[in-house]
A protein has these predicted regions:
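Interdomain "pre-motor" coupling segment immediately N-terminal to P-loop NTPase/helicase cores
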Residues: 1-6
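Conserved helicase motor core of SF1/SF2 NTP-dependent helicases
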Residues: 11-22, 29-52, 56-85, 90-93, ...
Length: 301
């Protein structure tokens, strides 16, 4: 349990140091800090699937760097209310939302800059931070998005940072927070490939609605069982015990096995699915192809 904490949602436990880093987290931290102490500059990128402890590692590094110098933590995406809770208690780290990144935002004043959810950075912000990394250390943490179609991603942040001269990259592989069963199902669903090991998914379910009315009834049924549902464009990054998502006729699988959508919303869907901690449900509306794929995965045994 002491590996599971999130600095954003459990700030008191983080500040009281009621947590441990895994051996992998400690090794990545050691390599990054060793190079920072020696060179005082450089770009560092670590990535992993949701639930591998990236944010905890990033904050632990921030705590070590902020002992004797000013550091800035940049948060990307819609989790502003989460990190503000920690900001009220952790004064030695200064905060900046990604929306305020610009030539006059004062990042040059800090001895180090850290970026959480870096896969959400806009191209202009990436370029500015890449330039800053030639003069002081910039550490990026972002989700691995390998299972998402390149056509849905466009130019991924990971590919951009790998092209930065001298960038040091790390891949986190040990899932800590995420339910392994749900994580494997999500990966298999996002891209269909032969040869993946079959397994049971007792905490994943699906229902089919032939029309709007049937889908609405199924959705209400899941809500009555304690599942949470978020509108497609809702900005919440909150992890939930039980999650239900709606898949409509926009979704399809392309010839390479990637899940695709008519409006390039698969990336958002991927990150939404990974908010489920214990149970995951799908309501599929007027889309027999996608429903049959999900059933095939669930009935593979």
């Amino acid at each position: 349990e002491l590996y599971l904490i999130s600095p954003l949602t459990e700030p008191e436990r983080f500040l009281n140091k009621e947590y441990f880093l895994t051996a992998q987290q400690r090794d990545i931290e050691r390599q990054i800090l060793k190079k920072i102490w020696a060179e005082r500059t450089g770009a560092y990128w670590f990535t992993g699937l949701p639930g591998t402890g990236k944010t905890l590692l990033l904050y632990d590094i921030a705590m070590k760097l902020s002992g004797k110098q000013r550091v800035c933590m940049i948060h990307c995406g819609e989790s502003k209310k989460d990190w503000k809770r920690l900001h009220e208690r952790l004064r030695r780290v200064e905060y900046l939302p990604d929306s305020e990144i610009g030539a006059k935002c004062g990042l040059e004043e800090y001895s180090a800059v850290l970026v959480d959810e870096a896969h959400l950075l806009e191209p202009g912000a990436r370029e500015l931070l890449a330039g800053i990394s030639t003069r002081r250390p910039v550490i990026f943490s972002g989700d691995c998005e390998d299972v998402i179609s390149p056509d849905e991603l466009g130019e991924s942040a990971e590919m951009v940072w790998k092209s930065v001269p001298g960038v040091q990259t790390f891949r986190m592989t040990n899932r800590i927070r995420t339910n392994a069963e749900l994580s494997v199902f999500i990966q298999n669903m996002m891209r269909l490939t032969r040869g993946k090991g079959r397994r049971m998914y007792p905490h994943v379910s699906a229902g089919y609605g032939n029309d709007e009315e049937e889908a609405e009834k199924l959705l209400k049924g899941y809500l009555a069982l304690g599942y949470r549902y978020f509108e497609e464009n809702a900005g919440s990054s909150e992890d939930v015990e039980r999650l239900v998502v709606l898949l409509d006729e926009r979704y399809f699988y392309d010839e390479t096995g990637y899940l695709r959508s008519g409006n390039r919303s698969v990336r958002r869907l991927f990150h939404r699915l990974n908010q489920a901690k214990e149970e995951l449900a799908f309501v599929v509306k007027k889309n027999e192809e996608v429903y049959s794929v999900i059933l095939g995965l669930l009935q593979a045994m």
